[in-house]
C-alpha cells in the first residue's frame, strides 16, 4: 500500500452513501481521496468529487473506468449492489488493492467469493460500519448467553423505502451473533415471515420483522422476551455519516495488512472485550 496517506476510491460516488463517504474521506487525517467511481453513462462523470459531495473542489474527478483509476488508490470502498461489488472485488484482487465492503444482500456464492479473495487481499466486510451497532452486536452475544435459552428472541428492523434487501444485513448479523452465542446455526432457527394460521411460536427460534417506510436511516431492536419481563437492545441511526466514518476508519486500519478478511469488531478491537 501507499507509504503516506491511505488513498481511497469511492464506488457509487453520486449516491447518498457515496457522497457521505467522500466527505468522511476528506475529513479523516491519514486518509486521502484518490478516486471516485460512477456507472458508465452517468451525468455525474467528469464532476469534481468534492464539489459533488458539497465539500469543495478536490481535483478528483468522477470516472467510470476502474482501469483509469487503478494507480490512484490503495483501498476501494464499496457500498453499492452485490453484482457491482463482485466485479470491483475481482479487479481489486487482480491488482492487489484492499477493500472495505459495506454492500449487503449477497447470496452465499457472493460471500464465498469475498472469502476467497481475502486469500490475496485485505478486506473489511461488515453488515454495518457504525461503532454503536458493533458494540450492540457484542452486547447481544453477552445477553444471549445469559438469557437466550429461556426467552423468545425477536429482531425488528426498519429502513427507508428505497432499501431493496430484507432483512437488512445488520439484522442478519444480529441473528448470527445471537445464534453463535447459543451454539446454533441461524439457518436452522431463523423465522423470516409469519402469515395466516402459524400455530404457537416454536421454542428456540429467532424471529425477524421488517419495516420499510419514509426516510428511516436504520433502526434495529433485539428483544429477549420472557413471562413478566423483556429486555430490548436497540440502535437507531439518524445519519449515514456514522456508517461513512466507520468505513473510512476501516480503510485506514487496513494499512499494512496484505490479506485476510476482517469486520468492524476487528477494527474496534471488540473481540478482546
Swiss-Prot record:
Its EC number is 1.17.1.8. The active site is at residues 159, 163. Keywords: Amino-acid biosynthesis, Cytoplasm, Diaminopimelate biosynthesis, Lysine biosynthesis, NAD, NADP, Oxidoreductase. The keyword Amino-acid biosynthesis applies. It is an enzyme of class 1 (oxidoreductase). PROSITE patterns: DAPB. CDD domains: DHDPR_N (cd02274). It is found in: Cytoplasm. One of its GO terms (molecular function) is oxidoreductase activity, acting on CH or CH2 groups, NAD or NADP as acceptor. Its main location: cytoplasm. (S)-2,3,4,5-tetrahydrodipicolinate binds at residues 160, 169-170. NAD(+) binds at residues 12-17, 38, 102-104, 126-129. Pfam families: DapB_C, DapB_N. InterPro entries: DapB_C (IPR022663), DapB_N (IPR000846), DapB_N_CS (IPR022664), DHDPR_bac (IPR023940), NAD(P)-bd_dom_sf (IPR036291). NCBIfam families: dapB (TIGR00036). HAMAP family: DapB. Homotetramer. Belongs to the DapB family. This is 4-hydroxy-tetrahydrodipicolinate reductase. It comes from Escherichia coli O127:H6 (strain E2348/69 / EPEC). The gene is dapB.
Amino acid at each position: 500500500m501507499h507509504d503516506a496517506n491511505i488513498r481511497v476510491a469511492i464506488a457509487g460516488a453520486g449516491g447518498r452513501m457515496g457522497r457521505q463517504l467522500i466527505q468522511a474521506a476528506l475529513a479523516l487525517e491519514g486518509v486521502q481521496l484518490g478516486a471516485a467511481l460512477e456507472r458508465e453513462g452517468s451525468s455525474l462523470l467528469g464532476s469534481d468529487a468534492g464539489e459533488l459531495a458539497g465539500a469543495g473542489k478536490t481535483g478528483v474527478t468522477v470516472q467510470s473506468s476502474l482501469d483509469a483509476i487503478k494507480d490512484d488508490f490503495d483501498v476501494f470502498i464499496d457500498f453499492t449492489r452485490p453484482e457491482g461489488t463482485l466485479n470491483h472485488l475481482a479487479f481489486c484482487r487482480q491488482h492487489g488493492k484492499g477493500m472495505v465492503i459495506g454492500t449487503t444482500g449477497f447470496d452465499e456464492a457472493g460471500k464465498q467469493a469475498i472469502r476467497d479473495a481475502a486469500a490475496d487481499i485485505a478486506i473489511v466486510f461488515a453488515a454495518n460500519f457504525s461503532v454503536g451497532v458493533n458494540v450492540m452486536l457484542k452486547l447481544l452475544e453477552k445477553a444471549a448467553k445469559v438469557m437466550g435459552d429461556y426467552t423468545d428472541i425477536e429482531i425488528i428492523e426498519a429502513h427507508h423505502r428505497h432499501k431493496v434487501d430484507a432483512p437488512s444485513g445488520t439484522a442478519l448479523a444480529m441473528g448470527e451473533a445471537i445464534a453463535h452465542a447459543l451454539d446454533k446455526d441461524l439457518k436452522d432457527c431463523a423465522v423470516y415471515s409469519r402469515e395466516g394460521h402459524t400455530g404457537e411460536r416454536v421454542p428456540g427460534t429467532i424471529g425477524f420483522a421488517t419495516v420499510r417506510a419514509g426516510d428511516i436511516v436504520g433502526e434495529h431492536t433485539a428483544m429477549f422476551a420472557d413471562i413478566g419481563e423483556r429486555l430490548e437492545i436497540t440502535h437507531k441511526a439518524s445519519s449515514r455519516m456514522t456508517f461513512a466514518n466507520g468505513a473510512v476508519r476501516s480503510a485506514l486500519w487496513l494499512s499494512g495488512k496484505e490479506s485476510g478478511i476482517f469486520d468492524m469488531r476487528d477494527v474496534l478491537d471488540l473481540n478482546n472485550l
